[in-house]
């Protein structure tokens, strides 16, 4: 048997900690020392030896001896570090020799030339505000000019890149530009965007080649097919016989300020000439350079006028970039060919002499025809007559804009757009309703139409009526994009808005329009209402299209088309069901965007006043629309129009209030007026064959024996004895638990026949019976709480009955109440006319 194991001696203190440290436990470490190597930064022999080897110095006697066991850094590593240091020095020396690089010097000279030209106009900013304005415009158009200049720079002037590659890129750029223009004219937006992306790639590659860089030829976009472009109108352009390419864009910066004075007279370009964009850019730069020379010579008036003329080239260039044909027959001549302008005393007359030349250079959408004379000649064809009237309205719009009457100018521009659509439709072989086109005063009728008696007076009256209508609609139309400095802007290609009729109806259309005057007043009111509603939906479709909401735009256009059919039906004397006319649109989002500035903060009281006023205006607008809808279903056109105008007025007042709040103004002064309205109540959402029963709530219902009021689980059952007692319509509500005042709010649809004799008998004698029950448990049946009875005689003159009935136990009142409603579309025997008195909010106009 083994003996007892010998006892171990007691462990000395601290021996367990040493064992833990040997195992890696409780090791103290400093993260900063691990990252920075603090222990190795001082008194490290290896690092000192490496430093001495790099610097070539000898070790100091006072230094500590390097620890044994660590070898110095190998010499091969040291030589590699030294070679790297020497290599950096050589690269710096190579960069110092870049000043002899011809490519970089050429690029630097181009940049400095543009900066010098821009800096020459800075000296006279204080003396001439107009020149400062023109300088700002010049800087904004600089990228366009640089792009055109880069396109026109000859290959001999480029220091880097092969000429063949550069010529290929330039030819490919012209190909993509023509393809993009052709796609835009054909209405192919996707193809136009693809061509524009390829054009940007080609332009960046051309810029790289011109700077001497290299590009991968495989990345050059391939040529695109131009396709069959639509027959464009004949264009008249200008040409300098001595200039075969847009050379003025390739002028050196030093010669920019010296315009060429040897330019010959302007001659029309043949069909084989290049794109007129380069000619326009060249002429624009000539005018800028001439303005710079005039400014240096001290002739600020001439410089200002030349800059104004140069500005107007931008409008034509924009139209040209959009793919629209441009008439260059009226382009101003070279600045050297213009006579010197007089001093400031005659500056205004010189402006009038130079401006028409530029105003004639505008985009055109039809064939080039002579200007309309003061006394128009007798047209031979329909196209001639349309073009004469189009030119007349264009001239009227330009003249109105020159006089500062933007409202009248926009009106003439819209009429001109109608004629442009008619010209396109006629050229495409479509049929146009010429009777709807306004006729300028004194113009002969369109060939093929029989002149009516007193045609001159009728045309003048029709023109005045159309002008007045367009002027009144100007404030509501959202066409701010048309308010530009362009005398006449070519519209986008779209379908003509005129009604298409057959040629046989052209001669009978005046008779049909004259028969409109013989319509009865009620029918005339219906036609006016339908036309206004159609115009409203067309405007809404246009706004939805501008917001890129194509589905909403299509929906509004379908409604407008259906209204057009109803208008034709009304003019033909057929009856119209106004209850089926679409309701007026409500703009929940508003017609404008409010910009709230951070520095404009209203007081808390002002914010509350604005909120209350806006709430009241919104409620009044909703009431007006509701009343208008009710009268529309009754067929009362006059009252419908009246309430629609009131709703429009409330909407305008709300917009004015929101705009004033956004500008940080104080709330406007306002007062209230008592207005009394005679309204006809109708529930248009109901059909004539249904009646709605609404069980709203129970109040303080009695509990059956053995049930406390808080444990009442109530539900309501009803019976409507129609069409007969055996086939009575029955239903019940859901169970509301644990309350004696349940809220049901349930709607039941009951089928009825308003003209049935049995329905009238039920309405007058029986009514609807209600029974309130307490829901039983699994082994207990439902317990009756009480009954109620609703009489329906008031439905003869009212379309809604609201009753709070007493709950009875047999014939004994229980103290409980039951609230119910019954609704019909309209009363059975008469109209539900109600008199409503409103406190009408009126905002007082602000003083100037």
From Swiss-Prot:
List all Pro residues biased stretches: 438-448
Please name the Pfam families in this protein's record.
C2 (PF00168), CC2D1A-B_DM14 (PF21528)
In alphabetical order, the GO MF annotations are: DNA-binding transcription repressor activity, RNA polymerase II-specific; RNA polymerase II cis-regulatory region sequence-specific DNA binding
Which compartments is it annotated to reside in?
Answer: Nucleus
The ranges of region (Disordered) come to 1-21, 53-75, 217-276, 326-353, 433-460, 476-523
SMART domains per the record? C2, DM14
InterPro entries per UniProt? C2_dom, C2_domain_sf, C2_Freud, CC2D1A/B, CC2D1A/B_DM14
Q: Which residues carry this modification: Phosphothreonine?
A: 586
The GO cellular component terms are:
cytosol; endosome membrane; nucleoplasm; nucleus
Q: Which residues carry this modification: Phosphoserine?
A: 455, 583
Family statement drawn from the similarity comment of this UniProt entry: Belongs to the CC2D1 family.
Q: What does this protein do?
A: Transcription factor that binds specifically to the DRE (dual repressor element) and represses HTR1A gene transcription in neuronal cells.
The protein, known as: Coiled-coil and C2 domain-containing protein 1B
Q: Tell me what organism the protein belongs to.
A: Mus musculus
